[in-house]
Each structure stands twice: as structure tokens, then as C-alpha cells.
Amino acid sequence: MISSDRRRRRALAHYEELARIGKVLASPVRLRLLDLLRQGSRNVDELAEAAGATVANSSRHLQQMRSARLVSAEREGKNVRYRIADESVSAAYGLLRGLAESILPEMDVLRRELGALEAGEREELLGRIARSEVTLVDARPVEEYRAGHLPGARSMPLDELPGRVHEIPREREVVAYCRGPYCPMATRAVEILCAAGYRARHLDLGVPDLRARSVPITKSEEPRRAKPTAGHRSRSTPRKQRKVP
């Protein structure tokens, strides 16, 4: 039978385990890597490029996150692909961000500067999306789009948007989204769209935020490309048609 003294020590030990997680999360670089992995799995080179960090530094941070079981890894040939351990890790990141937003005035300043929506405006926009009343543009890299996106969204990575904006129909309002409220890609996409004469707004929620709200998310192997509007030709290579016997 376990002694009362040992029971007490074991009860206190859980704080050490919590601190283990907290220590790993107490790094802006590791939080950045974790947020990127919430968008989809990546290898070290891809993560380093997306995070603006060196491969060596990113690898060290990922090893610490792996030791705390926040991320998992599997080998793909010569590369190692990382992903979040499970959805509870993504949820914990969202809760941490929500806590910071509720108690730190600096977060409110950042949100305003990045164009955060008011709650009522956000809900109205989500309702219009659910009713398929808008054209959705996913401004993230195509790999993130494949990992999960809003149903019906068109994959138009921000760096491709200026050359492909003509593919978007003009009949409806366009809503662009990216990685979440602290990602500037969607607001930049709206600037490009408005400059081209479109009615456009941004949604300040990313796919992990939408999943947390039980908004349907779909996956696809290939990005959906819009049909070119009248007067323009698609720059994509046409598929070979199968001959009908």
C-alpha cells in the first residue's frame, strides 16, 4: 500500500509535468511552429521556410516539442514530417491564445491593427458562408489548402492572386481567409481584390478556429480552380481529353 508521504509527493509531481508543457510553450518560435502545424503537416525545411527560421534552429525546437509530446514525427524517405500530436494540442493552443486575448490589452491592440472583426460581423459572415452566398478564397499555400479548407473555397495562394484574380466571378461578394486572426494574408488578399474592382471582405478565422466552432471542413488532393471569366483565358495547362471509342 502506498504511503501517505509518497502519495503527497506523487500529487505534487503533476505540477512538474504541467510545467514541462509550459516550458516548451514559453517560446515565440515554438508557438509559431506549432501554429503552422495546426494548418497541416510539414517537414523541417518547409516549416523553417514558413516560419522564417533556420533549419537547424527549427529542428531543435521541434525536438523539444516532440519530447513534450506536442508533435509527432514520421520518416518520409530522407525527410521527417511533423504534425500536431492530436486535435487536443490545437485546442490547447486556441485556449492559450484566447486567455491572452482576454487578459492582455496588447493582444487587443494587435487584433485591431490586423483588422479583427466584431463578433456580430463575424457571425453574420459565417452565416452567409453557410448559405453559400459568397465566393470563398483560401489565400494560404496550396499544401495547407489540401490539408483542410472550407467547402467550395478556391485555392488562391497570396503570391498567385494578382495573376489569377480574373478567375474569380464578379457576381457575388468575395470572402478571403487564411490562417487566423493574426495572419495578414487575408487582409492583403482583400486589398488586391478591391483594387481589381471586386467587393471583398476577409474572415478572421483560420481552419483550426473553424473546426473548434464545428464548421464543416473538407480535404482535397488537388486545389479547386475557378473557371476564367469572360474575356480571359486560364493560364493552366489544359488536360488531355480521353477519346471516346
Model-derived features with residue positions:
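Rhodanese-like catalytic fold shared by cysteine-dependent sulfurtransferases
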Residues: I2-R6, L18-K23, L36-R38, E46, ...
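Short capping segments at the starts of secondary-structure elements
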Residues: P28-L31, Q39-N43
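Core residues of bacterial helix-turn-helix
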Residues: L37-G40, A50-G52
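Helix-turn-helix DNA-binding motif, specifically the short coil turn and the N-cap/start of the second
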Residues: T54-N57
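Short, hydrophobic-biased segments on the C-terminal half of alpha helices
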Residues: L62-Q63, V207
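Beta-hairpin "wing" of winged helix-turn-helix
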Residues: R66-E76, R83
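Short hydrophobic beta-strand that contains or immediately precedes a catalytic carboxylate
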Residues: E133-R140, M156
